[in-house]
Amino acid sequence: MRWPRGLTLAVVLLTAPAGCASSGDERPEAPAKPAQGSPVAPTQVSPSPSAEPEESDRVEEPAERAGFHGKIDALPAALAAEIRGTTWKPGCPVPLDGLRILHFNYWGFGPAVRRGPMVVNAAVADDVLWVFEQLFDARFPVKRVALATEFHPARFEQHRRITSHRSVTASFNCRPVVTPLGPGDDYSQHAYGLAVDVNPLQNPYVTTDGFVRNRAAEPYTVRSRSLEGMIHEGDVVVRSFAAIGWEWGGNWSGDKDYMHFSLLGR
């Protein structure tokens, strides 16, 4: 098992407010870190149930098209200024200098190699980059990797439904926990840069009574299906995050957050 660099941080944060209760279910055996250049077995997927409109968000050009390339940097001054007052605000539980920006290649839908940025906590930057290297080697499709957008509480009123084909894989966002009941009072693990949401459209948050906020995600509520970008128990996504000590919201008791992986399992 890959030794999680964020383990000490997890111990420190055990007293942090919980966003959602995680289950006591046993997790699958985590894989050992593959030897350099040894790919994880490819994930077999079926086409999406319907074509999605092309997103207008800017896409970075891959550094190389043939292999995985990733890097970790301190937040550039321009980016720090850009997110100040939007996804980061004074009083957030992690300072700006406690964050890092990753840039890495990933397999998009299609498939095609794309490249995107992700902001995470500095303590877990190496581990998160390693996870996305495993996903790249397995050719697991990621719809889009991009920075999170500013959280607006009014958009998350209790049981308010939306229709959106946007599906952005992202991490840091200084915001509260959000459920179908609306925003909570506690910080989400995203506010610490210790959580990643992968393909949110294809892996929605589903309540125990079957409520899904995004109507466009309804085809993905049947978790026995194998549609492009879906995450399943024991697959390369779950196993790779487990190898760095992170837990999956798809294993929660009660509500399921199929997109969500976090260091503290909540």
Positions of PLM-derived features:
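Sec-dependent bacterial lipoprotein signal peptides
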Residues: M1-P17
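N-terminal low-complexity, Pro/Thr-rich disordered segments
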Residues: T8, A18-I83
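Sequence contexts marking disulfide-bonded cysteines in secreted/extracellular proteins
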Residues: G19-A21, G91-P93, N173-R175
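Compositionally biased intrinsically disordered regions enriched in Thr/Gly
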Residues: E54-W107, A112-P117, S188
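Catalytic cores and adjacent binding grooves of peptidoglycan-active enzymes
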Residues: D57, E61, P180-R266
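Active-site acidic/histidine clusters and adjacent loop/turn architecture
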Residues: V94-S164
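Structured segments of extracytoplasmic/periplasmic soluble domains
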Residues: W107, W130-K143, R175, L201-P204, ...
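Mid-length scaffold segments of soluble, non-membrane domains
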Residues: R139-K143, Q158-P200
